[in-house]
């Protein structure tokens, strides 16, 4: 007799190395808790519908719980010859409780079983990711709240642009993460759907109650089409996309952390707890955690591309190709959860070198736009003002000083309307004070932005 659940039709058994290639138990045992949760709901419903006896259902449920307990105590060894988590659990269940265990699969296929597992798993992981994003956002708000008056240079093309508040800069990542959080939240509507009861693809002749299992498993809704229920992997692609985009945002933030921590910038100092050294250069303190996060975005994006390619040519309904949906998702989930935790700790423990930042904006030309705006207040067209300031900057570069160092007489050679108040006008802190448009870097606008962010976090 074959040890395969499907072995009755076959005359020759696969060799061990073929079993190993076909099996998914090495990675889909990640789904053991979801598989048992789904099976308990299915067994409960079968008994309530009179399809199996209450006694058999109770035996099945107790057997499943004992398997779950023993697995987490490392007391169960699963077999590749049994292919996957579903058949390994069923085999162990029958071994423990006898023929009653063979009734569990009544009215169910591995097709809807694995889909149920994956929906339950993805829902839980997305909820965890949302919580981790919110936690990181909270740390960002705390840092920003303490640095509203800290001034730093902003950049375009990695060239100094304009002075801005450090709080305003770091809050940019709050809003990126807010959109990420919203995408994950919205995706739950498409994840939180029950496929159980679709069976292989066409439903079942048994009088099952899919609404009951939907309630037992706390799903928000159920699939209206059994074929769609076992064919759908959109929610996995969507989750991989949302993970990848969030990782892109973390990667951008990590790149800035790396730059800020260089000797050339010295804007921040990373904690030793989130840095490493060199095996040959004793002086080194490397931002390895930030670099790893920056690098891991390629990994999660690769999983997204892989899943898109897996599905692109699949006919309905289930195909073995779909086994490839798991490892990429599991790894992407592990990657983003780890990255979010590391990022939170890394920025929570970093030191912001406020004096260095405040001094930096006095040693560049990031206040050049302010000089042009000053000339505009003297009724000079902006394009003309731009030309005048460009010439002043060029002269400063040639003579080795900055706009705050230019003598008033020199300014007036370029335009007679420039008065002594120009020096106060060009001070970085005053540059920020004049930025009062909604969402700008001015202190009052940043404080307003922080109030909105705190309100969002409290919801």
Curated annotation (Swiss-Prot):
Broad class of enzyme this protein falls into: lyase
SUPFAM superfamilies: L-aspartase-like
Gene Ontology CC: cytosol
Annotated metabolic or biological route of this protein: Amino-acid biosynthesis; L-arginine biosynthesis; L-arginine from L-ornithine and carbamoyl phosphate: step 3/3
UniProt record similarity statement: Belongs to the lyase 1 family. Argininosuccinate lyase subfamily.
A Pfam family this chain is assigned to: Lyase_1
Main location per the UniProt record: cytoplasm
Keywords, alphabetical: Amino-acid biosynthesis, Arginine biosynthesis, Cytoplasm, Lyase
Catalytic activity: 2-(N(omega)-L-arginino)succinate = fumarate + L-arginine
Alphabetical list of HAMAP family matching this protein: Arg_succ_lyase (MF_00006)
EC number of the protein: 4.3.2.1
Cell compartment(s), UniProt: Cytoplasm
Superkingdom classification of source: Bacteria
GO biological process: arginine biosynthetic process via ornithine; L-arginine biosynthetic process
InterPro entries per the UniProt record, alphabetical: Arg_succ_lyase_C (IPR029419), Argininosuccinate_lyase (IPR009049), Fumarase/histidase_N (IPR024083), Fumarate_lyase_CS (IPR020557), Fumarate_lyase_fam (IPR000362), Fumarate_lyase_N (IPR022761), L-Aspartase-like (IPR008948)
Protein name: Argininosuccinate lyase
GO terms, molecular function: argininosuccinate lyase activity
